[in-house]
Regions:
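Cofactor-binding beta-sheet edge motifs in enzyme active sites
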Residues: 1-171
């Protein structure tokens, strides 16, 4: 990744904050992923445990470089909200009724309860030089990082969503 310094920088920031390479308690596993899109660079580290088919998300670390940053607190809030929406994506799916997508608004989405929200830590590493998004780029690496952590725990690759179709539920 030496030819992609922005990608590597957020990956390293997430890995450092997420204690990548440090031992975890028995039964807890990590996954990591990196993403570039919406004009930003982001990476995530997920920590999970799996008991049977129940997945417990213990911790999420998300690093974001959106270029210029006006409000670090607002960026952190957007990234954290992206995790909530990502959990919804992980566990639910769109349905078609009368030839239309049914889940067209928040009242029809399976938004997670507070009990399903993990500890979310953000690393904001704006470098300036460009204006990037902050909502979607936080959600994008979270899902593959979590799926990689499930793989580390179970040996089962998750290639399609929602997780419930793979036999998993959130603990």
């Amino acid at each position: 990744m030496k030819d992609y310094p922005q990608h590597l920088a957020v990956l390293n920031a997430a890995a450092e904050k997420g204690d990548w390479g440090k031992p975890l308690p028995a039964g807890v596993h990590r996954g990591i992923a990196q993403f570039m899109g919406y004009g930003s660079y982001s990476a995530a580290v997920a920590e999970v445990s799996v008991n049977g088919n129940d997945v417990k998300i213990h911790r999420m670390v998300l690093a974001t470089n959106c270029g210029h940053a006006v409000s670090l607190e607002q960026i952190a809030a957007q990234v954290q909200g992206g995790v909530g929406m990502g959990i919804s994506t992980l566990m639910s799916e769109s349905s078609v009724r009368d030839g239309k997508i049914y889940e067209i608004n928040f009242d029809r989405l399976a938004i997670p309860k507070i009990a399903h929200m993990p500890k979310v830590e953000t690393v904001l590493a704006p470098t300036g030089g460009f204006w990037g998004g902050v909502g979607e780029p936080g959600q994008a690496p979270f899902i593959p990082a979590l799926c990689n952590a499930i793989f580390a725990a179970t040996g089962k690759r998750i290639r399609t969503l929602p997780l419930k179709n793979q036999g998993f539920t959130l603990a």
